[in-house]
């Protein structure tokens, strides 16, 4: 199967969803050789990945992931970025996740170790005292009881090990860089998703439209962040399902919400421990650019989760989540519960 897919891609043809799904299954089961994997992702990168291809790869990846089953009736959201923007900001999406949870929206955060910064979400959560090595049942309990849970990508996508050596050796961005945020093990249907590669922002939005998303905001800022930025306008592709799926493009300016524009250098992070201190300071109410960028991203996430009707309303909900102590409380709850569950070794 992988051989026929390769022939088609090399000939310049576009894979449909089923073909891409079968190709990913061949990779996930170890059927595809390293040479075939490298040839496929390189050819796709040179030609440019299409939405049907990425959607099929996501479906193939989901079929081999370890799922997290949530027993919640309300919307559950993920706040995540592709990484790889090279700006080395602190972990904005991680801080944002606690604010969103503090505003009453459950968060099932999917993440990994460092990519574009010196510390990924997994590294920073560890530095904050959260256990990241939880099994599916334990993660579900965290989301349901603490309002937020974390799924460590390496644990929930073990089949990706077949592609890992190729990714390391190639050393350039491939389709795998965008798959993780699209393959949340809890199958969330609401997302704030940052994309580092400007050429893929609209494509990723249209991938979500082909999948089972209900409401998502896909973002990329003009200063290169895979977040909503304080330093430049942010392009937003909004995907909403209401009978039919609509994809709408708009631009977000921080000034429109009364936030001061500051360069992304003001959001620079450091080690996992340094970033953890920044995240905790934001949750404790410290003022400044770090707080403002988290408020801005949390406002967008609350809109994506249908918890706010506008960014202005989302901003007020986010402010209240921090200033009331609710966001910090979610961190403390997750810290206590994740450690207790890890020690108890809740069965999968």
UniProtKB/Swiss-Prot annotation:
SUPFAM superfamilies found in the cross-reference section: Nucleoside phosphorylase/phosphoribosyltransferase catalytic domain, Nucleoside phosphorylase/phosphoribosyltransferase N-terminal domain
Residues annotated as signal peptide: none
Binding site for anthranilate 2: 167
Keywords tagged on the record: Amino-acid biosynthesis, Aromatic amino acid biosynthesis, Glycosyltransferase, Magnesium, Metal-binding, Transferase, Tryptophan biosynthesis
Free-text cofactor note: Binds 2 magnesium ions per monomer.
Required co-factors: Mg(2+)
Residue sites binding Mg(2+) 1 per the record: 93, 227
Binding site for 5-phospho-alpha-D-ribose 1-diphosphate: 81, 84-85, 89, 91-94, 109-117, 121
Pathway participation: Amino-acid biosynthesis; L-tryptophan biosynthesis; L-tryptophan from chorismate: step 2/5
Any one GO cellular component localisation term in the record: cytosol
InterPro entries: Anthranilate_Pribosyl_Tfrase, Glycosyl_Trfase_fam3, Glycosyl_Trfase_fam3_N_dom, Glycosyl_Trfase_fam3_N_dom_sf, Nuc_phospho_transferase
Oligomer and partners: Homodimer.
Protein name per the record: Anthranilate phosphoribosyltransferase
Record gene name: trpD
């Amino acid at each position: 199967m992988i051989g026929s897919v390769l022939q088609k891609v090399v000939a310049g043809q576009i894979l449909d969803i089923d073909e891409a799904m079968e190709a990913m299954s061949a990779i996930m089961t170890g059927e595809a050789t390293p040479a075939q994997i490298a040839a496929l992702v390189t050819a796709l990168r040179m030609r440019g990945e299409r939405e049907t291809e990425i959607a099929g790869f996501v479906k193939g990846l989901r079929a081999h992931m370890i799922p997290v089953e949530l027993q919640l009736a309300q919307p559950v959201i993920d706040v995540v970025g592709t990484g790889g923007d090279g700006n080395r900001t602190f972990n904005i999406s991680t801080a944002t996740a606690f604010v969103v949870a503090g505003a009453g929206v459950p968060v099932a955060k999917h993440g990994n170790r460092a990519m574009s910064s010196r510390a990924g979400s997994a590294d920073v959560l560890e530095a904050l005292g959260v256990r990241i090595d939880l099994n599916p049942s334990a993660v579900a309990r965290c989301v349901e009881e603490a309002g937020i849970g974390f799924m460590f990508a390496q644990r929930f996508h073990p089949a990706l090990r077949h592609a890992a050596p190729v990714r390391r050796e190639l050393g350039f961005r491939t389709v795998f860089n965008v798959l993780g945020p699209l393959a949340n093990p809890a199958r969330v249907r609401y997302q704030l998703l940052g994309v580092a590669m400007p050429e893929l922002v609209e494509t990723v939005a249209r991938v979500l439209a082909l999948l089972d998303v209900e409401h998502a905001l896909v973002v990329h800022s003009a200063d290169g962040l895979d977040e909503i930025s304080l330093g430049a306008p942010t392009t937003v592709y909004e995907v909403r399902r209401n009978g039919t799926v609509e994809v709408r493009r708009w631009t977000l300016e921080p000034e429109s919400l009364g936030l001061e524009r500051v360069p992304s250098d003001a959001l620079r992070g450091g080690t996992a421990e340094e970033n953890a201190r920044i995240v905790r300071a934001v949750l404790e109410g410290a003022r400044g650019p770090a707080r403002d960028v988290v408020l801005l991203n949390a406002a967008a996430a609350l809109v994506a989760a249908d918890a706010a009707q506008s960014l202005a309303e989302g901003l007020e909900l986010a402010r209240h989540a921090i200033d009331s102590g609710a966001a910090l409380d979610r961190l403390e709850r997750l810290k206590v519960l994740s450690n207790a569950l890890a020690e108890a070794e809740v069965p999968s």
